[in-house]
Amino acid sequence: GLNPRTGDRILEIGGVELNNRMLTGNNFHRYINPERDSEEGALAVHGLTTEFLSDKPKFAEIAEEFRAFIAGAELIIHNAPFDIGFLNAEFKRLNLPPVHEQVHGVIDTLVQAKEMHPGKRNSLDALCDRYGVSNAHRKLHGALLDSELLADVYLAMTRGQNSLSMEEEVEVAADGAALEIVP
């Protein structure tokens, strides 16, 4: 789906943890039963069918585990308003606080990329190409794979001439998690 305000739901959440600019191996990945049928347009993007998701946990069943994963973290998200909108809609259904009250902050790599590369394509695939991050194995949009790709892109983006100071870089990465949510 494309819009949580029209009832679209999260189908998959994936996140990887970075600590001192290194992947820790502490990943979060869950498929989620959206309690509704997959839409044709969304199905073409992620390939997750209604049948596949039917026996997966509902968001309410994984919410506390996910909240523990992101608690106090600096989230690194590509096109953050899109993903945060879906997360906040799910949290609101459960009477839980919005994302910004649960995390240290959010870095939007799309905003960063547009500042660093104005007028250029700045999709995750375009950034993978620009920074030499291999995404050849990516056929469909998948939350965990996209999180891993985004972590590599973020590290490449922030080590160049336009990077933050080293102190800021380490502070951001020390408790940061790159997240991608597939609505």
Regions flagged by a language model, labelled:
Residues G1-V103, K114-H117, A126-L140:
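Conserved non-catalytic scaffold segment of RNase H-like nuclease domains
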Residues H78, I107, L145:
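Active-site flanking residues adjacent to catalytic metal/cofactor-binding acidic residues
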Residues V111-K114, D129, D152-L155:
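Generic alpha-helical structural context detector
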